[in-house]
Amino acid sequence: MKLHELHSAEGSRRNRKRVGRGTSSGYGKTSGRGQKGQLARQGGHTRLGFEGGQMPLFRTMPKRGFKNVNRKEYAIVNLDDLNKFEDGSEVTVATLKENGLVKKELSGVKLLGNGELKVKLTVKVNKVSAAAKEAVEAAGGTVEVI
């Protein structure tokens, strides 16, 4: 078998619809658009959500809420995650990234108090919850907000 002998399987490729090529083609004269009316016209389609002049559903619903453009989102790290580090080591945003605990930095890193800390660490993050700070200090470590 040679490259020029290859053919696609029978019925796997459909011929394109050639419209406006005589009445015997089945798609002549009106080209499959029906008779008169908006959809028979050139560019005659309505926009998304248009309901024929009736008040659209999305406009009958009340407007609610807004997006705060100044919102800061922090990558979250829990106390459980910090048990990966060796006793007495320093935990920074960079070391958290290296160990895969933080995927993307966003506006910084926040330490939350979920779980139990079993090692003594020096933690340097952007934000800390009160419970997390208490737990780190109870384990003999220190917390520094950068």
Curated annotation (Swiss-Prot):
- Entry keyword Transferase: no
Compositional bias (Gly residues) at which positions? Answer: 23-35
Q: Name one GO biological process term.
A: translation
The region called Disordered is annotated at: 1-55
The keyword RNA-binding appears for this protein: yes
The record's Gene3D superfamilies line, in alphabetical order, gives: 3.100.10.10
What Gene Ontology cellular component terms go with this record?
Answer: cytosolic large ribosomal subunit
* Basic and acidic residues bias: start-end ranges: 1-13
Q: Which family does it belong to?
A: Belongs to the universal ribosomal protein uL15 family.
Recorded hits in PANTHER family, A to Z, give: 50S RIBOSOMAL PROTEIN L15, LARGE RIBOSOMAL SUBUNIT PROTEIN UL15M
Q: How does it assemble?
A: Part of the 50S ribosomal subunit.
Q: Tell me the function of this protein.
A: Binds to the 23S rRNA.
Q: What is this protein called?
A: Large ribosomal subunit protein uL15
From what organism does this protein derive?
Lactobacillus acidophilus (strain ATCC 700396 / NCK56 / N2 / NCFM)
Lineage runs: Bacteria, Bacillati, Bacillota, Bacilli, Lactobacillales
